[in-house]
Design a protein with these regions (language model features):
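Residue-level marker for isolated small/hydroxyl-bearing positions within beta-strands
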Residues: 89, 131, 171, 217, ...
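Hydrophobic beta-strand positions that form the internal "hydrophobic ladder"
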Residues: 86, 128, 168, 214, ...
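Extracytoplasmic beta-rich repeat domains
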Residues: 35-79, 108-124, 147-164, 187-211, ...
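Loop/turn-rich, solvent-exposed surfaces of beta-rich toroidal or solenoidal domains
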Residues: 330-337, 345, 349-378
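Short loop/turn segments that connect beta-strands within beta-propeller blades
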Residues: 99-102, 141-144, 181-185, 228-230, ...
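Short coil/turn segments within WD40 beta-propeller repeats
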Residues: 93, 134-136, 175, 221, ...
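C-terminal motif of bacterial Sec signal peptides marking the signal peptidase cleavage site
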Residues: 27-30
């Protein structure tokens, strides 16, 4: 284990050199001290790009004998900062509870399918909700992993559920949105659209709860808003394929909306950001579904993230920097994009390694992403420049989770990693 970790860290320098020339580029801008998360003009990372990200520990979590033929570890860990625990799924059909300090296993819950879902921890009940590729959605005790209830949704569940309004909102791969009672797992209401078989690529959107409505996207290219309590449609389905056809002059071959909608408040009102795989990225009015702006050049998008930076005082004594935000789009075909949230205008674009990258996760003023065929990277949200990277021989497909300066992720080889990102001083 120690020898493998040493090789992993030793490969960092060569990896950074290769990527700076062929993919993400070398860092030119980074982040301010952790006290405000801002990005100074001359960050420490500019002088020490190879020491921003450190591995605290690695733990081989998934035994080769238990793997069930899935070469990737997907989903995203869930952090319980009070209990100092991390919950993560695996390709060995299990959900693990680990001690955040050292990665030691607390318990493991067995399902009959890959657990590629991002778990949801509820600190009020001290329980974990998660889905499996066996088609079931589970509620288990966070203390000992004992089953509370299981709901069969009849299709894989890999997106994180949302707990709000006294209901659990769950989406499965069969284009079904469910509102479940947390105490029993019984259905309060459900909505379903016929899947566009053969017109989707991979993955699907999760639920967003925003201003009393639940938003999600479907494989037929539609985005719909429902009343969070009753499930009634709150605006007519928005067909992003039709929107893209008007711009492109033809119907996209891949209709699916794979990104979980992302909310924002613009000066003109509330919006949700969504992406059609072949049609581009769109901002929709959150109240009506009317298009605010499109960017049809940003195709192949699987994840969206809204990065924010608070207003701050420059360290060089210059004028105060205003608050700013950037919409980050992850695409395995067109790269990593930074877009203006108000207009959709491209601010920057970076090529990514073959196989694409995960959703970017804000940490210490930067963004952490993983590459399915390479490893873990830290990039600047202001320009996408590479700050640091760690090569992983099996690659890393799982989206990392961050709390403060700590991050957790599992590699495709089944090794669970704890990392620290040092902020510039």
């Amino acid at each position: 284990m120690k020898r493998a970790l040493s090789r992993l860290i030793a490969a960092r320098s060569g990896l950074l050199g290769a990527l700076s020339a062929a993919a993400l580029g070398l860092a030119a801008t980074s982040c301010e001290a952790i006290r405000n998360g801002a990005n100074p003009e001359m960050p420490l990372w500019l002088q020490r790009p190879n020491s921003a990200m450190q591995v605290n520990y690695s733990r081989k979590l998934v035994a080769p004998s238990r793997r069930a033929g899935e070469p990737y570890e997907r989903g995203q860990p869930e952090i319980d900062p009070v209990g100092k625990r991390v919950f993560t799924g695996s390709s060995d059909n299990g959900l693990y509870a680990l001690r955040a300090a050292n990665g030691e296993q607390i318990w493991r819950f067995e399902t009959t399918g890959f657990v590629q879902c991002a778990p949801l921890y509820d600190p009020v009940e001290d329980v974990v909700y998660f889905g499996s590729n066996d088609g079931a959605f589970y509620k288990v005790s966070a203390k000992d992993g004992k089953l509370r209830w299981r709901f069969m949704s009849n299709a894989e569940v890999s997106r994180r559920a949302v707990l709000q309004n006294g209901l659990l909102y769950v989406v499965n791969a069969n284009d079904t949105l469910l509102a479940l009672e947390p105490a029993t797992g019984k259905i309060r209401w459900s909505q379903h659209r016929s899947p566009a078989t053969g017109m989707e690529v991979a993955g699907y959107a999760g639920p967003l709860l925003f201003r009393g409505k639940v938003y999600t996207g479907f494989s037929d290219g539609n985005v719909v808003a429902y009343d969070a309590l009753t499930g009634a449609e709150r605006w007519q389905p928005v067909d992003l394929a039709a929107e893209a056809e008007q711009t492109l002059g033809e119907v996209p071959q891949q209709l699916d909306v794979d990104t979980t909608p992302v909310p924002n408040m613009l000066p003109t009102g509330p919006v949700v950001y969504v992406a059609s795989y072949a049609g581009g990225v769109f901002a929709l009015d959150a109240e009506t579904g009317v298009q605010v702006w499109p960017n049809t050049a940003v195709t192949g998008v699987s994840e969206l993230t809204l990065w924010r930076e608070p207003a701050h005082v420059r360290r060089d004594g210059g004028p105060p920097e205003p608050a700013r935000s950037i919409l980050i789009a992850s695409s395995g075909t067109t790269g990593l994009w930074g877009l203006d949230p108000e207009t959709g205008r491209e601010l920057w674009r970076r090529e990514v390694p073959s196989g694409g990258v995960s959703a970017p996760v804000p940490i210490s003023g930067a963004l952490m992403v993983t590459a399915s065929r390479m490893g873990i990277f830290l990039v600047s949200p202001l320009g996408g420049e590479l700050i640091d990277g760690i090569h992983v021989s099996d690659g890393t497909s799982m989206t990392p989770s961050a709390y403060g300066a700590r991050a957790f992720v599992m590699t495709n080889g089944g090794t669970f990693l704890s990392l620290t990102v040092a902020s510039p001083i």
